[in-house]
């Protein structure tokens, strides 16, 4: 059964790559284990091409998330992981990257180095980012948060992303 699922999945990826006219490897994001702090570029790098999105983000609570942490909580991995850029698991393992405080673009869209390198190389079609869905938000907006409030994805996503660029 597992083999059947793998064959079916590889067929779906292959067909999707043909439909998108993209190389298969561009559709497959690196696994979280392959991503390190060095793969994160920071919101200022995103701003170079996505100024409207940056300006909209800069007016959100995400842009001020690290400053909202109490001083005592800034050394707790379970708190910091959701208040700086990177996955909570990566931050717990490597510590926060000082130049990337707050919940920046890459906290939700994924590490940007590969995306930026592709775009700068003239391959904007392959400059893909992580798909954002409710599960992305629930990595931090969940019952483990000491200030948890019920999270309604459709209502909240519009507060963060007010622009498509």
Model-derived segments and spans:
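Short sequence/structural segments immediately N-terminal
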Residues: 2-5, 14-165
């Amino acid at each position: 059964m597992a083999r059947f699922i793998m064959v079916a999945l590889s067929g779906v990826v292959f067909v999707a790559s043909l439909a998108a006219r993209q190389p298969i490897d561009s559709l497959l994001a690196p696994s979280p284990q392959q991503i390190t702090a060095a793969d994160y570029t920071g919101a200022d790098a995103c701003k170079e091409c996505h100024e409207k999105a940056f300006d909209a983000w800069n007016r959100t609570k995400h842009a001020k998330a690290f400053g909202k942490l109490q001083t005592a909580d800034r050394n707790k991995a379970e708190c910091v992981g959701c208040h700086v850029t990177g996955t909570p698991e990566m931050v717990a393992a490597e510590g926060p990257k000082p130049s990337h405080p707050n919940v920046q673009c890459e906290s939700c869209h994924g590490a940007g180095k590969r995306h930026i390198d592709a775009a700068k190389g003239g391959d904007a079609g392959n400059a893909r980012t992580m798909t954002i869905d409710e599960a992305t938000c629930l990595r931090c907006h969940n019952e483990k948060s000491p200030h948890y409030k019920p999270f309604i994805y459709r209502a909240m996503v519009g507060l963060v992303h007010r622009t498509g660029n």
